[in-house]
Amino acid sequence: MSSESSTEGDSDLYDPLAEELHNVQLVKHVTRENIDALNAKFANLQEPPAMYLIEYQELTSKLHELEAKEQELMERLNSQDQQEDSSLVERFKEQPHYQNQTQILQQQRQLARVHHGNDLTDSLGSQPGSQCGTLTRQPKILLRAHLPNQQRTSVEVISGVRLCDALMKALKLRQLTPDMCEVSTTHSGRHIIPWHTDIGTLHVEEIFVRLLDKFPIRTHIKHQIIRKTFFSLVFCEGCRRLLFTGFYCSQCNFRFHQRCANRVPMLCQPFPMDSYYQLLLAENPDNGVGFPGRGTAVRFNMSSRSRSRRCSSSGSSSSSKPPSSSSGNHRQGRPPRISQDDRSNSAPNVCINNIRSVTSEVQRSLIMQARPPLPHPCTDHSNSTQASPTSTLKHNRPRARSADESNKNLLLRDAKSSEENWNILAEEILIGPRIGSGSFGTVYRAHWHGPVAVKTLNVKTPSPAQLQAFKNEVAMLKKTRHCNILLFMGCVSKPSLAIVTQWCEGSSLYKHVHVSETKFKLNTLIDIGRQVAQGMDYLHAKNIIHRDLKSNNIFLHEDLSVKIGDFGLATAKTRWSGEKQANQPTGSILWMAPEVIRMQELNPYSFQSDVYAFGIVMYELLAECLPYGHISNKDQILFMVGRGLLRPDMSQVRSDAPQALKRLAEDCIKYTPKDRPLFRPLLNMLENMLRTLPKIHRSASEPNLTQSQLQNDEFLYLPSPKTPVNFNNFQFFGSAGNI
């Protein structure tokens, strides 16, 4: 009898179904942790590797199988539990207190479900055979957090965990820290919650995280990547190696190699340097930050320049000894804010620049003032243009004037070296096939540290006046940097004039509209016009007139980003007669403004003439055809447009175009230049139109409205990068030549 009871007790202690269920739960927990680890490492990548997708599919399918197995075992355990309950009731039915035993059993099971959750319950009573278990899952309590920039996340409410620790992972992914933000229970930010608050004590379902005013961070969802050749010493921010030809974001200035594209952060978020400097100045307003006060002299103690320092100190002491002593006492009483090394790195040394940049002109000007012969060149900067051997100086103004003169000489020297850096030798450029020709030159695809576009100008033998005008305009073009402007990379002056620009992977707007007949949506059409107006507004802010804006000079990338090319260069776009400019119109006929056709003024090109050409481009987009298609005689078009007798037919504009967009195009092509708006109000109107169009609003954290499942075969036929290793793959390798 005792042996039978012992075997029954062992069978009650060891349940094979419960043991199997426990093992399945452990394997499912490990599988879920593997999936979370894979997602944390590869889910943020725009193009995850194929091995990650395969492993993710295998783990998810395995997880589904384990969940099905767990459900099956739980059903079997429940059925076995019911059978044991029925047998238990029959066994104790003869006893008078069996009803009380049944009630106690049910109460103990309910307590076991609450306290143990998914685990097996312990023994429920002292009676043998009363041990049985139920498996239930306790629901998780989540707290929704609204993050800055219209993003949100959810965290599990666990007692004992601080609020900053619960949100730390979400903040780090967005390059934020708790010091930059504050938490409140309302959207207005009235009820502030401390970061060290226990998350289990919060009695709200959602919280709001917003940035503090002293740390404004402009965040963009999408980077504006631009290919660039860096002529200065630049390092990749992904691998920290030297970067020569690569990419950078025009918004956050993140620079990287092509092979380091997977290290680019998901959010375009520039570092708030201006706010950081403002915060430093606000904390200590008396800090001079290296700027000397009025009547004080600046001392730079550098061991390598001790000789120049001795020369400058001797000259200044002989000319003005009392002010130097007072300033010295002032410096002894108040220590400097910034060390000498930091000052020498942040700004140029005035004494060193004066020594290095003393030219013959300054020496001649000093000799003309009947000064005694100088024993050493380093004493030039200490003497003033209005001082004499017998005069005394009351302040250090003459020294500042000599510093200004030396800075001018330094700027002239830097401008000369910078001009030489932008000049490209014709032997360095590998000319490829001819792409096209226009009214001012011919465009070739070429290779110069990467694919570039070379436009040889029609000015074959430039005169000195033409060459000087060309250099002046190149000096203006090399300062243009904008996301809607083709990047100017350099120029060639010998044997013929040519400019080197960024190569645009795409086709022109003219080809899209009139050759391929691409049907743009209305919001896409307005966005193209907005980008063109934005680029032209930037050029006009730089005092650059395009002179030949047309759909052939507007290029579209695959993502419909706009690049404006062939801007500026009035030297090449002007007819020359010997050493003088000829008074003849240049450009394309259909996009010429009436005042340009008439040529009644010496220089009829203005900002309004570019606005007229922009109006014709907008008419092409709206009507999907060229203006004046019913007239084949060019002279007739020139005469009628110049007299104001011919205007584009606005009845051919697409029917779904809003009236405001039609009025905008009509205002741009008005006959009188003063009646045409400039690009700044045009840009504002186009942005308002694009903002008021009905569209599907989507969250900033999920920019893609529909997420397509990536397949494994999408990663099998990726094109190889255009690097110098694959040099034989260039199309122009067989027909190489020089300018």
UniProtKB/Swiss-Prot annotation:
InterPro entries in the cross-refs: C1-like_sf, Kinase-like_dom_sf, PE/DAG-bd, Prot_kinase_dom, Protein_kinase_ATP_BS, RBD_dom, Ser-Thr/Tyr_kinase_cat_dom, Ser/Thr_kinase_AS
Start-end of Phorbol-ester/DAG-type zinc fingers: 222-268
An example molecular function term from Gene Ontology annotations: protein serine/threonine kinase activity
Name of a matching Pfam family: PK_Tyr_Ser-Thr
Reaction(s) catalysed (UniProt annotation): L-seryl-[protein] + ATP = O-phospho-L-seryl-[protein] + ADP + H(+); L-threonyl-[protein] + ATP = O-phospho-L-threonyl-[protein] + ADP + H(+)
Active site: 548
Gene Ontology CC terms: cytoplasm; cytosol; plasma membrane
Compositionally biased region (Polar residues): 380-393
Domain RBD: start-end pairs: 141-212
Modified residue annotations for Phosphoserine: 346
Keyword Cytoplasm: no
Consequence of changing residue 465 to T: In strain: 5-17-88b#5
UniProt superkingdom: Eukaryota
Gene Ontology terms: biological process: border follicle cell migration; cellular response to starvation; compound eye photoreceptor development; dorsal appendage formation; dorsal/ventral axis specification, ovarian follicular epithelium; epidermal growth factor receptor signaling pathway; epithelial cell migration, open tracheal system; ERK1 and ERK2 cascade
Binding positions for Zn(2+) 2 per the UniProt entry: 236, 239, 257, 260
Cofactor note: Binds 2 Zn(2+) ions per subunit.
Phenotypic consequence of gene deletion: RNAi-mediated knockdown in the prothoracic gland (PG) delays the onset of pupariation by prolonging the L3 larval stage.
Cofactor needs: Zn(2+)
E.C. number(s) listed in UniProt: 2.7.11.1
Subunit structure and binding partners: Interacts with Dsor1/MEK1 and ksr; Dsor1 binding to ksr probably promotes ksr and Raf dimerization and ksr-mediated Raf transactivation.
Role description: Serine/threonine kinase required in the early embryo for the formation of terminal structure. Also required during the proliferation of imaginal cells. May act downstream of Ras85D in the tor signal transduction pathway. During larval development, mediates Ptth/tor signaling leading to the production of ecdysone, a hormone required for the initiation of metamorphosis.
Protein name, UniProt field: Raf homolog serine/threonine-protein kinase Raf
